[in-house]
Amino acid sequence: MNDNAFTFQTLHPETIMDALFEQGIMVDSGLTPLNSYENRVYQFQDEDRRRFVVKFYRPERWSVDQIREEHQFALELVKDEVPVAAPLAFNGQTLLAHQGYHYAIFPSVGGRQFEADNIDQMEAVGRYLGRLHQTGRKRPFTFRPDIGLAEYLFEPRQVFEDAALIPSGQKAAFLKATDTLLSAVTECWRTDFATLRLHGDCHAGNILWRDGPLFVDLDDARNGPAIQDLWMLLNGDKAEQRMQLETIIEAYEEVSEFDTAEIGLIEPLRAMRLVYYLAWLIRRWGDPAFPKNFPWLTGEDYWQRQTTTFIEQTKILHEPPLQLTPMY
């Protein structure tokens, strides 16, 4: 069974509690599901009133070696005093198994939502991203992939071609817009950037604030350019994004060098994320959680909007990239 066909319907509460009991943890509260579609994540409290989070990984998405690399990276970051949510070890192992599922247990870490429009918080995030990347540069991932065109563009293009859920009246226009976008990204893409281990999905929703930033969810960690962990923090118009990026880079460079030439990768990376995310939704459609939570995916209007989004992103790729002020 591949990861596209898999569902979590056999992951019952009793199965979860049995898995935790095997590690010496008695659940003394209910299992509260947290927002995660790719995996299944639950918060709970044990009999000593300690709070934990347990994460059950979607089978076949990542190999055991790839998940262990993610965990090792998180533990390295903690050792280097970078604030991340890292898995706990049981008998020396962070990746655990029960009834065919792989899972990990984390301490439950509370915090407020990171405020992307707060300049002080943005500076702190930039500084800690510099430290995170210092650790990331020590060595690359061996088993986890690099960010590249095949995974983020060409494989999704085939998913779109094969997808039965795209309305027939919209498919031709959508595929045409996709092909035009892919060509534009390919023209802009560079492979001469330095790569390092990244958080990979560093947006505001994966940063908590507790007297400073706390990075969570390294599930998408990959090798790639440093800018991948910066651009998703930007929002607003170009002037606002320029100010935000300058704030991040200035703080980042207090602890780590940043190649400003990578700024030209922001819009190609944005396009790649748009394409990859849409293909991900289609791939996961067999999981009942997806039709339930994304019912609009089969609608004509939705695919019209996606076609327009791809056309607009293609236009942006033909414009000059974001420019920093001359002091940079």
From Swiss-Prot:
The keyword ATP-binding applies. Its EC number is 2.7.11.1. Its main location: cytoplasm. The keyword Kinase applies. Keywords: ATP-binding, Cytoplasm, Kinase, Magnesium, Metal-binding, Nucleotide-binding, Phosphoprotein, Serine/threonine-protein kinase, Stress response, Transferase. It catalyses: L-seryl-[protein] + ATP = O-phospho-L-seryl-[protein] + ADP + H(+); L-threonyl-[protein] + ATP = O-phospho-L-threonyl-[protein] + ADP + H(+). Disruption phenotype: Decreases long-term survival (1000-fold decrease after 20 days in liquid culture), derepresses curli production under non-curli-inducing growth conditions. GO terms for cellular component: cytoplasm. GO terms for molecular function: ATP binding; magnesium ion binding; protein serine kinase activity; protein serine/threonine kinase activity. Induction: Expression is growth phase dependent and sensitive to the media conditions reaching high levels in stationary phase (at protein level). It is probably regulated by the CpxRA two-component regulatory system. Mg(2+) binds at N206, D217. The record marks S36 as: ATP. Its cofactor is Mg(2+). It is an enzyme of class 2 (transferase). A protein kinase that (auto)phosphorylates on Ser and Thr residues, probably involved in the extracytoplasmic stress response. Probably acts to suppress the effects of stress linked to accumulation of reactive oxygen species. Monomer. HAMAP family: SrkA_kinase (MF_01497). Belongs to the SrkA/RdoA protein kinase family. This is Serine/threonine protein kinase RdoA. It comes from Salmonella typhimurium (strain LT2 / SGSC1412 / ATCC 700720). The gene is rdoA.
